[in-house]
């Protein structure tokens, strides 16, 4: 029975891995965006973490996960002589890589961490049925990589500590690599392994060789990571230059995050946010069951004494010191806590668990900013389909320039636009984020040309004659359907505003959770607007009355 359940959950994980939801900008801009430009020559816009004077992100742990698959994909296409892989193929290839890493490494680690066979099956199924495993863990997050590194770090700590007669040299080397990769991936990594790592002290005391190997290889991998990062950020630097004047990204990251003024730019939260808000959001009914187990028993429950629980709770406590606290920072806690907690057979819990994860799975795995990636992939085709001449020929087609305004969405990844080698097209993407509607309208007023300039109208209009063949400048607006401010430009009375929006494309599976204005509209009206008007639209902006 458990095998059939696990296989079914595996198919569910595949479905969500290939669903283009968008959980946080970091999943694109701190990984794929970086390497797509260098490996596949796609347009890319690097975030400040990689462009500041003191960069805080390392490429050392990212290269094998993102650059290597992209490089292999490019090599495969070159060998077949079929050009460059499309952004869509590259995007879903990376999702497939993350799925495989989750399926193989995460599930394997859980199997290793749970000692009793009957508990292993329940733990693996429980972790596999979590919406966090379906969504966050199959997306290109550094937090997802951190989960794999933390779980395997605990596996190796257990293996090394359990060896009484041998030095476990190979395990120490691998643990050194995992430790260095974890620290260079995210500076939060040591918080999860610091307390469990104390188990190694007796072994290191009995077997000094293990300690020597761990430290020596740790230094080697650290130097390697520093050299790779330094030469990435300063390509002209030699190995000696990198050693003399190194760029140590984890140190830069730590110095940045210890300043409250820097964290305030990203949002400050109360110190109890992780324990009282983020963990319940990630664990749902399992969190309630864990609290009840503490309440109902006078002694400390056995699950609370496990290595997984110690790692998760000590890590959460250490991360709670910092005032910037997002749920994704606790992704490693989910498999750790679910694998150590022993649930009694309860129909109420099973029903609540299924409802919670199905609801959050579809919300976060399908609808959450779900239109950004498909629309960005479709933008070149949308523009080309609406600018070709009536004979649909690419010959003598003037070069097209398009300004695309993204409003009330997450930042669109530039690399998903691809090379546009099949159509003479220049795309200027502008991220307006969540600016007020009046400011967005002012931006449109400045960009949309008057009727006399013969711009902003697609070439397929029946009135587009030979004298208007030079219409090559277009302004598009991409915004959620729930943005009611745009209704004044899309209705029949749009002419009174001087601008009108003509719908060109719509992607229905999109919900903007950052547009919940409960204070102004009220709860029910807000939910009706955001969930009732699902979808992400692409509009052509032009002057009203232009034919």
Swiss-Prot record:
Glycosylated residue positions: 391, 419
One GO term (biological process): GPI anchor biosynthetic process
Subcellular location: Endoplasmic reticulum membrane
Keyword Glycosyltransferase: yes
GO molecular function: alpha-1,2-mannosyltransferase activity
Catalytic activity, EC: 2.4.1.-
Pathway(s) annotated for this protein in UniProt: Glycolipid biosynthesis; glycosylphosphatidylinositol-anchor biosynthesis
Transmembrane parts of this sequence: 5-25, 58-78, 96-116, 175-195, 208-228, 348-368
Keyword Signal attached: no
Topology versus the membrane: Multi-pass membrane protein
Disulfide bridges in this chain: none
Superkingdom per UniProt: Eukaryota
Keywords, comma-separated and alphabetical: Endoplasmic reticulum, Glycoprotein, Glycosyltransferase, GPI-anchor biosynthesis, Membrane, Transferase, Transmembrane, Transmembrane helix
A GO CC annotation given for this chain: endoplasmic reticulum membrane
Function, in words: Alpha-1,2-mannosyltransferase involved in glycosylphosphatidylinositol-anchor biosynthesis. Transfers a fourth mannose to trimannosyl-GPIs during GPI precursor assembly. The presence of a fourth mannose in GPI is essential in fungi.
Family: Belongs to the glycosyltransferase 22 family. PIGZ subfamily.
Protein name, UniProt field: GPI mannosyltransferase 4
Originating species: Aspergillus fumigatus (strain ATCC MYA-4609 / CBS 101355 / FGSC A1100 / Af293)
Gene for this chain: smp3
């Amino acid at each position: 029975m458990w095998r059939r359940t696990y296989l079914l959950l595996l198919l569910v994980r595949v479905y969500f891995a290939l669903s283009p939801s968008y959980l946080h900008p970091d999943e694109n801009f701190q990984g794929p965006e970086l390497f797509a430009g260098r490996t596949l020559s796609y347009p890319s816009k690097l975030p400040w973490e990689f462009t500041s004077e003191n960069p805080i992100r390392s490429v050392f742990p990212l290269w094998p996960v993102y650059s290597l698959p992209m490089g292999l994909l490019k090599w495969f296409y070159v060998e077949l002589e079929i050009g460059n892989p499309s952004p869509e193929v590259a995007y879903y290839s990376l999702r497939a890589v993350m799925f495989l890493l989750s399926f193989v490494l995460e599930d394997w680690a859980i199997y290793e961490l749970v000692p009793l066979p009957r508990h292993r099956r329940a733990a693996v199924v429980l972790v596999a049925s979590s919406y966090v495993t379906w969504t966050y863990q199959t997306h290109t997050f550094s937090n997802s990589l951190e989960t794999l590194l933390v779980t395997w770090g605990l596996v190796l700590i257990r293996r090394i500590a359990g060896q009484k007669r041998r030095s476990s040299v190979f395990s120490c080397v691998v643990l050194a690599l995992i430790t260095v990769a974890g620290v260079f991936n995210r500076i939060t990594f040591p918080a999860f392994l610091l307390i469990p790592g104390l188990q190694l002290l007796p072994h290191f005391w009995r077997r000094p060789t293990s300690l020597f190997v761990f430290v020596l290889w740790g230094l080697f991998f650290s130097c390697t990571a520093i050299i790779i990062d330094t030469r990435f950020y300063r390509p002209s630097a030699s190995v000696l230059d990198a050693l003399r004047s190194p760029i140590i990204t984890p140190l830069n990251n730590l110095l940045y995050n210890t300043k409250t003024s820097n964290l305030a730019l990203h949002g400050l939260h109360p110190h109890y946010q992780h324990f009282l808000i983020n963990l319940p959001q990630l664990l749902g009914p399992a969190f309630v069951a864990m609290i009840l187990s503490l309440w109902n028993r006078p002694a400390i429950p056995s699950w609370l004494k496990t290595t997984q629980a110690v790692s998760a709770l000590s890590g959460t406590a250490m991360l709670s010191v910092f005032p910037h606290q997002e749920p994704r920072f606790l992704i490693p806690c989910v498999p750790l806590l679910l694998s150590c907690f022993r649930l009694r057979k309860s129909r109420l819990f099973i029903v609540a668990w299924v409802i919670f994860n199905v609801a959050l799975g579809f919300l976060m795995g399908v609808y959450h900013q779900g239109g950004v990636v498909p629309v960005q992939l479709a933008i070149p085709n949308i523009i080309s389909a609406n600018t070709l001449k009536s004979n649909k020929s690419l010959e003598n087609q003037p070069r097209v320039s398009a300004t695309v305004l993204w409003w009330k969405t997450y930042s669109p990844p530039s690399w998903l636009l691809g090379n546009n080698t099949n159509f003479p097209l220049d795309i200027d993407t502008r991220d307006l984020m969540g600016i007020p509607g009046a400011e967005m309208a002012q931006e449109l007023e400045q960009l949309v040309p008057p009727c006399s300039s013969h711009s902003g109208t697609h070439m397929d209009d029946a009135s587009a004659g030979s004298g208007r063949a030079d219409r090559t400048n277009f302004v598009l607006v991409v915004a959620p359907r729930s943005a009611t401010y745009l209704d004044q430009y899309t209705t029949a009375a749009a002419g009174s505003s001087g601008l009108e929006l003509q719908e060109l494309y719509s992607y229905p599976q999109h919900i903007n959770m950052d547009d919940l204005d409960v204070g102004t509209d009220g709860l029910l009206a807000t939910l009706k607007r955001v969930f009732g008007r699902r979808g992400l639209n692409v509009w052509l902006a032009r002057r009203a009355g232009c034919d």
